[in-house]
Amino acid sequence: EAEKKFKGFIDLVVYSKKDEKIHLIDWKTCSWGWKPQKKSDKIMAYQLVYYKHFYARKYEVDPKDIDCHFVLLKRTAKPGKKAEFVRVTAAKKRTTDALNALTKALHNINKENYIKNRIACTNCKDRFGTCEFYQTKHCL
């Protein structure tokens, strides 16, 4: 398979003397916050898992010394509650799972085997207009 290169942008990297850890931060804007399902969504978390894995590899840092967080920037929240930290754990098992998912995705892309997101398709039937491919020749 062909070699692939990725470019990612970590919004903020902070070293804390207090806990002697590097904190990788990704800003997310939202109106009010996230529901618990979104906070625990593994695919969403994989973004930070990849950041941690590749940051540790590039800078030769022990992954145990890196913590990851989404910071929700809430547009409609009350003053003093406009930001919320959502910690994302990225232990060995989750990192292995994320890297396996990436390998599988790259394999399918290289084979031009594009997999339909049937969850989004099911939802779009109830909310007409949210999927640009709904009821077209591209909707399988």
Question: What is the role of each PLM region?
Answer:
Residues 41, 53-140:
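Metal-dependent nuclease catalytic regions and adjoining charged, substrate-binding loops involved
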Residues 1-48:
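Non-catalytic protein-protein interaction segments used by genome-maintenance enzymes to assemble
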